[in-house]
Amino acid sequence: MSDKLFHDLVTLFVVVNPIGVVPLFIAVAGHESAAARRRIAGQAILISTVILFVFIGIGQIVLEALGINLASFRIAGGLVLLIIALRMVLQEAHDPRADSSAIYGNIAVFPLAMPFIAGPASIMAVVLMTDNNVYSVRQEVETAALLVVVLGFTYGCLVGADFVLRLLGLTGANVASRIMGLTVAALAV
């Protein structure tokens, strides 16, 4: 595996944060049947895949049409990543099963697909990792394939959310989320 592929894999794993989305998934879908949770997980991954592949395909074109160069986007993205990282590291630990927030509409779309799986950090990452002026089409296709792998792993984490949460425990899930936050902070600078 080349250095770029390894870097892209780690970056995608960190910004998508498959383990970190498990507590949220339990909070919003934990009351559903196993079949409904699989359906919600599948929809969330499908929607996230479409969003991220649209940005792989036309994200750079849209930025250029808006007059935003990738260097500026990289700086802005780094700042966004830093803010997200700080939130991940400094958030209060809580039991996601005790979260009684109201759920409106399709939870696969919001909050799962957007903003948690295909959020600002993921979108920024895929646009930068598939820069048409820097990377060959082959490298961009490899990065897209890595995205599919990470989203597949995320689907597995969502479908096995109860197991993952039992394995890690609430404390472990919170620790994993904070470690991901520190990694995101390191990527941001």
Predicted features by range, described:
Residues 1-15, 91-92, 96-113:
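Small-residue-enriched transmembrane helix starts and helix-helix packing motifs
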Residues 4-21, 70-81, 141-154:
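Structural signature of hydrophobic alpha-helical transmembrane segments
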Residues 4-54:
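Juxtamembrane transmembrane-helix termini in multi-pass membrane transport proteins
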Residues 13, 22-28, 110-115, 123-132:
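Generic transmembrane alpha-helix signature in multi-pass membrane proteins
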Residues 34-60, 133-166:
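A small-residue-rich subset of transmembrane alpha-helices
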Residues 38-89:
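Membrane helix-loop-helix hairpins that form the core translocation module of multi-pass transporters
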Residues 67-71, 156-176:
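Membrane interface segments of multi-pass transport proteins and intramembrane proteases
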Residues 80-100, 187-189:
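Transmembrane helix exit motif
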